[in-house]
């Protein structure tokens, strides 16, 4: 799959599959950027669409198994690709589909951040715990107008806690980076726990 990408897309691909970059939201943006890099290749239009579809299927079957947000995003970004006319302006189609997804996603994220801020501030929540890296959870906590105390378990399996620390400190919050095994020792003092939605499964 990596070989189907231009050079600028291969680094993004590697960052996802190696786990160097975490967060479904970030991975979705990187997948969109890879599709846009395919649009810039000097290859037949139908092959560009085919590569984008194959790339999307790859990530749906791999990263999408742990985060359905990936599956939904890829489906939205590639909508209409399979039926596209060979004479269509494929570069423009790819660009428009990817950008439309991110415009809608940005609007939705801003609304989530606003509602999160209302919840935390209206309920007077002062001590939070965040678990398992999520770029959306990061944006929510960074977007709070008032400083809070945040406990961040290390999420050792994928080092999923560490990426939270710097943004929270820079936003003015008091941060405790703790071992996973210490979670139960602090839960009694926590007002609320927030995790990325992909941590939950219907079953």
Predicted regions located by residue number:
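Short beta-strand segments
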Residues: 32, 131-132, 195-196
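A short, well-structured juxtamembrane/interface segment
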Residues: 104-124
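Nucleotide donor/acceptor-binding cores
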Residues: 125-126, 148
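Gly/Ser/Thr-rich loops at beta-strand to alpha-helix junctions
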Residues: 24-25, 127-137, 157-158
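Histidine-anchored nucleotide/phosphate-binding helix
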Residues: 134-146
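Long amphipathic alpha-helical segments
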Residues: 1-97
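Conserved phosphate- and dinucleotide-binding cores of soluble alpha/beta proteins
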Residues: 147, 153-203
């Amino acid at each position: 799959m990596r070989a189907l990408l231009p050079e600028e897309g291969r680094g993004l691909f590697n960052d996802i599959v190696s786990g160097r970059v975490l967060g479904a939201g970030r991975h979705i943006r990187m997948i969109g950027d890879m599709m846009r890099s395919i649009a810039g290749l000097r290859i037949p239009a139908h092959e560009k669409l085919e590569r984008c579809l194959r790339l999307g299927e790859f990530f749906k079957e791999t990263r999408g198994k742990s985060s359905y947000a990936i599956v939904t995003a890829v489906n939205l970004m590639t909508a209409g690709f399979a039926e596209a006319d060979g004479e269509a302006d494929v570069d423009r189609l790819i660009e428009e589909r990817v950008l439309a997804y991110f415009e809608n996603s940005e609007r939705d994220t801003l609304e989530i951040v606003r509602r999160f801020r209302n919840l935390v501030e209206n309920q007077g929540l002062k001590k939070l715990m965040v678990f398992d890296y999520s770029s959306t959870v990061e944006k929510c906590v960074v977007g709070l107008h008032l400083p809070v105390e945040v406990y961040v378990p290390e999420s050792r399996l994928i080092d999923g806690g560490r990426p939270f620390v710097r943004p929270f400190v820079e936003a003015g919050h008091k941060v405790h980076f703790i071992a996973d095994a210490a979670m139960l020792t602090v839960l009694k003092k926590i007002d609320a726990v927030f995790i990325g939605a992909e941590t939950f499964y219907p079953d």
